[in-house]
Curated annotation (Swiss-Prot):
The gene is ilvD. It is an enzyme of class 4 (lyase). This is Dihydroxy-acid dehydratase. Mg(2+) binds at D85, D127, K128, E450. Signal peptide: none annotated.
Length: 565
């Protein structure tokens, strides 16, 4: 590939007499005379031993590196960070999770631009790796491909499949006296059997599936198990495809368009994906300069059915979906019914129609993961945008898989996740209550923690169908039940959620997509006059910088919005 038909960015480093010192440094890392005309490709390697999500990524990076060399490129491997949501969940450390999305994006952008690289292959596993990498790709706009680290296989105990969410729910079950300490320990020991990202259609698998649908990852790659050989082969194949994309000068913004983002959102709805996808795709669209709002998610939700019976509210995990035909099977069904844009370009240079040409029109009848079109799990999508006087800018809810999609009840108000969790575990929350967790938003937390511990405790206590929960924080992809997150404006900036008092009646009406506080405008005005913002929880360091810069969740919680206005 030494004779690329397009000018290489790396020539500012590799060509000319003045760059002799630059070349001297490159020779030290393995460049030879004949290598200075080859494309330099960065491999953003999120390998880490702190989480099973990322502990198998080094093998994928090595396979991709070798394949890039064979394809005539010069790979340069660099590290980027990860936070384990599952390990930090319920702790102060979870405040860094969403922050890490920005750190990942900024770090990849910094290295690729700082070293004048010609292409990027990013490999990630845990939740924020995916959007962080894609935000960077959209900003950089050099030929890029994303390689997912792969999903974990399910654990097994007492005749049932387990995921990490099983362990969170077991805590609630134990606290409610529904299981013994021995059973709790058994679930803990069996929930995570090896490498790979959390196994249901939680955030990591949702985002990887969406990237495949968008055309930035290879077909079938998003549902492969991390420990299977086909995942390593997929990393090598991704490298080969990227080398060809560099030749053809196919760039992320050729792929990340309004149409392809609509395709991704349609697939997210069809597979029953995570609420976090809303936040992340708002941020990805912002990075790619593609107009996208919360209302667009609601428009797509209304026309796309849920086709896949996947955890957290369903029965199966991502490896089951892979055996049933994977994301291409879901996409083919959507395409056949006019719910995908088939003319979108993918990183391989093919269109969506071309990629899906040989995929069957309907799923195999000998599986139950993907429902036939005439018999969907739900006739409309599950991620609803709720609005009302409690969320004028909007809020995000999962509205399928709940027995009671409407609830009106007294507010139980908590100004932190920890105080709420303690109340649940000590039996203070009753059927019919509407739990409010506030000051957990992007600025207020800061960091918009995921409320998996409280929601799992509610489920474990047997209250999942009778208790509502709203928050200006987020939810894990493993959350289900009558839960509403991303309430905006958040409490810290004076949103209505800051004015809720203990015992106020709140209505969550999922079918009507309403979130209403039953307090008069006059009383709210009196409360607002008395309200003042709390002192920032952090005044120095990463969280302080984040809180100062971050936007509303309704805009994706981005940190580079209107910086110079």
């Amino acid at each position: 590939m030494a004779n690329s038909p397009f000018p290489l960015r790396s020539q500012v480093v590799t060509q000319g007499v003045q760059r002799s010192p630059n070349r001297a440094m490159l020779r030290a890392v393995g460049f030879r005379d004949e290598d200075f005309g080859k494309p330099i490709v960065g491999i953003a390697n999120a390998h880490s031993t702190l989480t099973p999500c990322n502990m198998g990524i080094q093998t994928l990076a090595e396979r991709a590196e070798a394949a890039l060399r064979t394809a005539g490129c010069m790979p340069q491997v660099f590290g980027t960070i990860t936070i384990s949501d599952g390990i930090s969940m319920g702790t102060e450390g979870m405040k860094y999770s969403l922050v890490s999305r920005e750190v990942i994006a900024d770090s990849i952008e910094t290295v690729v631009n700082g070293q004048s690289m010609d292409g990027l292959l990013a490999i990630g596993g845990c939740d924020k790796n995916m959007p962080g990498a894609m935000i960077a790709m959209a900003r950089l706009n050099v030929p890029s491909i994303f390689v997912y680290g792969g999903t974990i296989k399910p654990g097994h105990y007492n005749g049932r499949d387990l995921t990490i969410v099983s362990a969170f729910e077991a805590v609630g079950e134990f606290s409610a006296g529904r299981i013994s300490e021995e059973e709790l320990l058994a679930v803990e020991r069996h929930a995570c059997p090896g490498a790979g990202s959390c196994g249901g259609m939680y955030t990591a698998n949702t985002m990887s599936s969406a990237f495949e649908a968008m055309g930035m990852s290879l077909p079938y790659s998003s549902t492969m198990a991390a420990e299977d050989e086909e995942k390593a082969e997929s990393a090598a194949q991704s490298a080969k495809v990227l080398a060809e994309a560099i030749k053809a000068n196919i760039r992320p913004r050729d792929i990340i368009t309004r149409k392809s983002i609509e395709n991704a959102i349609s697939v997210i709805m069809a597979v029953g994906g995570s609420t976090n996808a809303v936040l992340h795709f708002l941020a990805i669209a912002h990075a790619a300069e593609v107009p996208l709002t919360l209302d667009d998610f609601e428009t797509i939700r209304a026309r796309v059915p849920v086709l896949c019976d996947l955890k957290p509210s369903g029965r199966f995990v991502a490896t089951d979906l892979h055996r049933a035909g994977g994301i291409p099977q879901v996409m083919k069904m959507l395409l056949n019914h006019g719910l995908l844009h088939g003319d979108c370009l993918t990183i391989s240079g093919q269109t969506i129609v071309e990629v899906l040409r040989d995929v069957p029109d309907e799923p195999s009848p000998d599986q139950e993961v993907i429902r036939p079109w005439h018999s969907p799990l739900y006739p409309q999508g599950h991620l609803a945008i709720l609005k009302g006087n409690l969320a004028p800018e909007g809020a995000v809810a999962k509205i399928t898989g709940v027995k009671n999609p409407q609830i009106t009840g007294p507010a139980r108000v908590f100004d932190s996740e920890e105080s709420c969790l303690q109340a649940i575990l000590s039996g203070q929350i009753r059927a019919g209550d509407v739990v409010v967790i506030r000051y957990e938003g992007p600025k207020g937390g800061p960091g918009m923690r995921e409320m998996l511990s409280p929601t799992s405790a509610i489920i474990g206590a047997g209250l999942g169908d009778s208790v509502g929960l709203i928050t200006d924080g987020r939810f894990s992809g493993g959350t289900y039940g009558m839960v509403v997150g991303h309430v905006a404006p958040e409490a810290y900036v004076g949103g209505t959620i800051a004015l809720v008092e203990e015992g106020d009646l709140i209505t969550i009406d999922a079918p009507a997509r309403q979130l209403h506080l039953h307090v008069s405008e006059e009383e709210l005005a009196r409360r607002r006059a008395r309200w003042s913002p709390p002192e920032p929880r952090y005044k120095r360091g990463t969280l302080a910088k984040y809180a100062k810069l971050v936007s509303s969740s309704s805009l994706g919680a981005v940190t580079d919005l209107n910086l110079w206005d």
